[in-house]
Amino acid sequence: GEETELNGQGPKITDEAIRELYAKLDEIQDGDTLVLAGSIPSSLPADIYERILERLSGKKIRAVVDATKDLLLNVLKYRPFLIKPNNFELGEIFGVEMKSTEDIVKYAGKLKEMGAQNVLVSMAGDGAVLLDENGKTHVCGVCRGKVKNSVGAGDSMVAGFVAGCEKGDYEYALKLGTASGGATAFSEGLAEKDRIYELLGQLG
């Protein structure tokens, strides 16, 4: 089938709202996880992600960044815990076409060299690849099901991966992330727990 996505204009973010955001961020404690995802509204500084990570650089947090091109590249110096480009975004960053899993592993490795601790690359119908902080490469296939709505699937994958990391097992985290993304893609809305664990069973 065909999917049509309509993206409206985001709100104008005021200086007061930015100050409120910083105040909330200052409450983050060591061991917490912060997810920065998506594009930057035009009313915010283009380097807002960098400013946030610089502000929190003295804390031992797990920063997750799901963004594209310069927005992603410019935060690598802060050694984010996880970044999640898809295969097309990875190709855009380096100006090359990703033709194989080997290509993805090669260029994801370059992002690790630039500072990322873990690099998770989603490949739509071809599964996902994870290069973890311990130097291991993990490959995961896709779940079986009918795609109803792909919006939010990438965000669900990040959420599932982060939740899976609580076990300290990157192989499991990758599978839980994949199942979470699939559960959203196969639903009219967002993933639900029962569906996630049903799909997790497909991944072994």
Name each region found by the language model.
Residues 43-51:
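Active-site core of PLP-dependent enzymes with the aminotransferase class I/II
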Residues 11-14, 40-44, 71-73, 92, ...:
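Short, small-residue-enriched loops and turns at beta-alpha junctions
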Residues 1-32, 199-204:
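Conserved N-terminal subdomain of the carbohydrate kinase-like
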Residues 3, 89-91, 145-146, 164:
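A short, flexible beta-alpha/helix-coil linker loop
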Residues 50-136:
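Conserved phosphate/ATP/ADP-binding segment of small-molecule kinases
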Residues 4-16, 36-43, 59-62, 94-97:
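Flexible, glycine/proline-enriched loop segments at strand-loop-helix junctions
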Residues 5-7, 31-38, 66, 84-89:
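Short beta-strands and strand-loop turn motifs
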Residues 101-204:
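Conserved phosphate-binding/catalytic region of the ribokinase-like
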